[in-house]
Design a protein with these regions (language model features):
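Outer-membrane beta-barrel translocator domains and adjoining extracellular loop/strand segments
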Residues: 37-43, 106-122, 164-173, 208-217, ...
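Face-selective signature of the C-terminal outer-membrane beta-barrel domain
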Residues: 87-103, 131-302, 311, 318, ...
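Signature for the C-terminal beta-barrel architecture of outer-membrane proteins
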Residues: 363, 388-400, 404, 410-424
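Hydrophilic extracytoplasmic domains
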Residues: 272, 297-299, 315, 326-329, ...
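Membrane-proximal, glycine/serine-rich, low-complexity loop/turn segments characteristic
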Residues: 1-164, 174-201, 234-244, 314-339, ...
Length: 476
């Protein structure tokens, strides 16, 4: 921080109000000592796993360093939350929750990027002051009815946030905002032969974003309307579980982009039908699962249809209380997100450009994992080891053109692949009499892939060169 003599504080207030069939809880927290409260509201609502993921074109720059986060976060944060619950009986309840977070982060950053090219190595250094102001608000209403034969849950949410990042040295102001409203309905009916589950998700999101530079301003106005409706049947008998799930999913996704010299009205709306059978068998020391999701998807503006899949299997063997072994494998075919499908050229920061080049990226990934563990709670001794292999095959590859003033990524139609190996192990030993616990973690990884670079030859003509790379990493 620029002011080393700044007074540090951390404080919190809370209040609890109880009544017949209802209760209220209010919380307020504030600090400027580096403690991260950005996820405080998410933890209080507790249902972020049901949120529909959103893809944007601009994002605030992050920072990565081998330090604890509170040593990097020069902040001033205030967060306020109120929670009120009405409980009419043992089955039915209604919860209302509202929260607001105001956060200001100021940092002096230094960054070095090294690009290895066939004929040269380019190093780009930058040092700048960065100020990020964030205002985030959320509202949630949740109704639950949990009887012996039926479970009903309906959750309605409204979320909004404004993030404004500014760097004077870079001459860059980046603003990302979001306003979304969603409804999440879930019904489970229990029967003697099995159970039925019905889910319905509807969400609308508006995401305006802008990049202001000395040369001008780029604006992204993005609208997304998403719905997902499904029915599932689950049956368990004698250690064998089977589930069949079918549904329909659709999204209307549009973008209005300025400046208008690029495609300014982009539409990536799509509709899909999906089916997911799932099986699980447990016999003694063995447990195995098999899942085979299938999805038929149609992109209307692109006039493209796809069959996506994600089969996976899991096998676990528990030798005894101490030893457990497992094996996992999956194969997944997917398409790019909304920003990946945009066909034109757009700028993400003061020197970085991305060009979709009108291509439709797809990806097929296979993943395998081997895991083993030993535990002895009496002697407080634990050891785990995991080996993971992943390979991705893609139909497109970003070609990079790097100079000191600009970095341009252009998508090219070129089949390519990348693969990675990861080995991780943890050993832990505790000594109860000494109140001592020690642990050692080892992480070893290797990644291989392909890189496409645009270069100028001796005559000044531009050409593309495909290279392979390897990256090794060891941490203990």
């Amino acid at each position: 921080s620029d002011n080393n003599d700044k007074l540090l504080w951390e404080a919190g207030l809370n209040a609890l109000q109880l009544g017949k069939g209802k209760q209220s809880v209010y919380n307020y927290k504030t600090n400027n000592n580096g403690k991260d409260l950005s996820n405080e509201q998410t933890r209080l609502t507790g249902n972020n796993q049901q949120q529909v993921p959103l893809s944007g074109f601009l994002s605030q720059p992050g920072i990565s360093a081998p330090l604890d986060k509170n040593r990097l976060l020069f902040n001033e944060t205030h967060t306020l939350n109120g929670n009120r619950m009405y409980k009419w009986n043992d089955d039915r309840s209604l919860r209302l929750q509202a929260g607001y977070t105001h956060d200001i982060i100021q940092q002096q950053r230094g960054n070095t990027q090294i690009y290895y090219q066939p004929t040269d190595t380019i190093q780009i250094d930058e040092t700048y002051h960065y100020r990020l102001r964030s205002d985030i608000a959320n509202l949630e209403l949740r109704y639950e009815d949990n009887s012996s034969r039926n479970y009903i849950s309906n959750r309605f949410t409204v979320d909004g946030e404004i993030n404004r990042g500014r760097s004077e040295e870079l001459g860059q102001t980046l603003q990302t905002s979001q306003l979304s409203a969603g409804n999440y309905f879930n019904l489970i009916r229990n029967r003697e032969s099995g159970s039925w589950e019905f889910r319905s998700v509807t969400q609308y999101a508006y995401q305006p974003a802008s990049l202001l530079l000395e040369e001008g301003k780029s604006k992204f106005n993005q609208h997304n309307f998403y719905t997902d409706n499904s029915a599932a049947y689950l049956r368990k008998y004698n250690g064998f579980t089977q589930q069949y799930k079918a549904g329909i999913q659709g999204e209307q996704a549009t973008l209005k982009y300025t400046p208008t010299k690029q495609p300014n009205d982009f539409n990536a709306s799509h509709l899909s039908l999906y089916l997911t059978p799932y099986f699980q068998l447990e016999r003694g020391k063995w447990l195995t699962t098999l899942s085979f999701p299938l999805k038929a998807e149609r992109y209307f503006s692109q006039q493209r249809s796809f069959l996506f899949f994600n089969p996976s299997t899991y096998l676990r063997y528990k030798l005894d209380y101490h030893w457990t072994f497992s094996l996992y494998g999956s194969l997944k075919r997917s398409a790019g997100d909304f920003s990946d499908l945009y066909p034109g050229l757009y700028q993400t920061d003061y020197r970085t450009w991305r060009d979709g080049n009108g291509l439709f990226p797809t990806n097929t990934t296979q993943t395998y994992n081997l895991y083993g563990e030993y535990k002895n709670t009496v002697q407080e001794f634990f050891i785990t080891a995991a080996l993971t292999y992943s390979r991705s095959n893609r139909n497109t590859l970003f070609e990079q053109s790097v100079s000191e003033d600009a970095i341009v990524y252009t998508r090219r139609e070129l089949p390519n692949h990348s693969d990675s190996w990861n080995l991780s192990s943890t050993l832990s030993k505790g000594i109860y009499d000494w109140h001592l616990k020690t642990s050692l973690t080892l992480l070893l990884s290797r990644s291989n892939g392909e890189q496409l670079t645009r270069l100028a030859d001796s005559k000044g003509n531009q050409q593309s060169l495909l290279q392979t790379y390897r990256y090794d990493y060891l941490k203990a």
